[in-house]
């Protein structure tokens, strides 16, 4: 069973990831990820991206879009198994398209996988999908 120190270290690595995302900080994103040709990333609405160079390029494209962003991870759950960690959470996003318009809000669900390498937790997989709006359920929907 993972001890509290390991869970806190994974939580810190996960927070660094979201800090890099919110600040559009490519250098910090470089520090968060493991630089291997097998790491994977799936952004909402994107195809699977494989390999650090392509994953890095995807973050560069997102950050170059110019939209400011606030992101908060909520309902974070962490499981550590040996040198691997699974983090699941919701991402609550506020995207600022310009300095005048109201932000666009979105909620995604994410799975982040980390591997401990030389005592440091590095991201090896990020998958985020938009949470669909729940359809309104009427009484007639419940009658079979």
Predicted features along the sequence, with ranges:
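A beta-strand edge to alpha-helix "cap/lid" segment located at domain peripheries
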Residues: 2-31, 39-144
């Amino acid at each position: 069973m993972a001890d509290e120190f390991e869970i806190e270290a994974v939580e810190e690595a996960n927070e660094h990831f979201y800090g890099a995302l919110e600040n559009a900080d490519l250098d910090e994103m470089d520090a968060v990820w493991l630089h291997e040709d097998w790491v994977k990333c799936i952004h909402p609405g994107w195809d699977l991206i494989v390999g650090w160079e392509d994953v890095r390029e995807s973050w560069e494209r997102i950050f170059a879009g110019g939209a400011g962003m606030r992101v908060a991870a909520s309902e974070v759950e962490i499981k550590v198994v040996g040198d691997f960690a699974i983090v699941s959470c919701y991402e609550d996003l506020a995207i600022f398209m310009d300095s005048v318009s109201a932000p666009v809000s979105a909620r995604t669900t994410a799975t982040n996988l980390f591997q401990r390498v030389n005592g440091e937790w590095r991201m090896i997989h990020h998958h985020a999908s938009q949470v669909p709006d729940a359809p309104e359920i009427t009484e007639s929907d419940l009658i079979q």
